[in-house]
């Protein structure tokens, strides 16, 4: 299989987030175009990941669907691959995101479009973490995932959302520096 399927499942949510960004905001804050695009993107990505899970050879314990691209003068390689454990985490991520989108439609009262963008971008980074075979790329995806999580907690969180967002960001950032 020559098609870069792991890159596709990683960046499809990011493309969906771009389309959600391009939708026109409506005055009633229930941007149905953004909702439909988010649901469509996340469900399509889930079914593609189901296909990958079905296609993986479960008798092989080595990495499969390996993609490798030189990135920074051969020092850092953009290398993706999955094994039996990582595909389960990717599948779980792709299963949870549509549920989050459906549940947030009525519970998020302000800036629903921005929330959906943050959720799709977060899906991209989480899947990137589970597909990465290069330590630098893994670290970049992991750290980049802090940004949408910080926004989700800080804008749409509970009563002490700003305090919680900064604590989450600092503890996770400082903890990952040791990696």
Labelled PLM ranges:
Residues 15-17, 97-98, 119-126:
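Hydrophobic, membrane-inserted alpha-helices
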Residues 9, 79-80, 130, 139:
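Residue-level signal for helical boundary/lining positions with a hydrophobic bias
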Residues 18, 88-89, 139, 148:
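Hydrophobic positions within alpha-helical membrane elements
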Residues 1-7, 19-102, 106-117:
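Transmembrane helix-loop-helix hairpins at membrane boundaries of multipass inner-membrane proteins
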Residues 9-13, 38-41, 93, 119, ...:
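Residue-level recognition of transmembrane alpha-helices
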Residues 26-34, 125-179:
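Alpha-helical multi-pass transmembrane bundles of energy-transducing inner-membrane proteins
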């Amino acid at each position: 299989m020559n098609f870069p399927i792991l890159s596709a499942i990683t960046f499809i949510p990011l493309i969906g987030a771009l389309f959600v960004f391009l939708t026109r905001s409506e005055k009633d804050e229930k941007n149905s175009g953004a909702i439909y695009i988010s649901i469509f993107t996340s469900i399509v990505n889930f079914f593609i990941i189901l296909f990958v899970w079905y296609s993986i050879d479960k008798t092989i314990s080595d990495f499969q669907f390996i993609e490798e691209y030189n990135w920074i003068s051969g020092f850092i390689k953009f290398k993706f691959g999955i094994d039996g454990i990582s595909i389960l985490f990717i599948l779980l991520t792709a299963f949870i995101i549509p549920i989050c989108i459906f549940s947030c439609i009525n519970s998020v009262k302000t800036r629903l479009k921005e929330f959906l963008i943050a959720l799709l971008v977060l899906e991209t980074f989480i899947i990137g973490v589970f597909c990465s075979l290069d330590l630098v790329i893994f670290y970049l995806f992991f750290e980049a995932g802090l940004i949408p999580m910080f926004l989700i907690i800080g804008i749409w969180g509970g009563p002490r959302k700003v305090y919680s967002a900064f604590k989450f960001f600092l503890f996770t950032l400082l903890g990952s520096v040791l990696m």
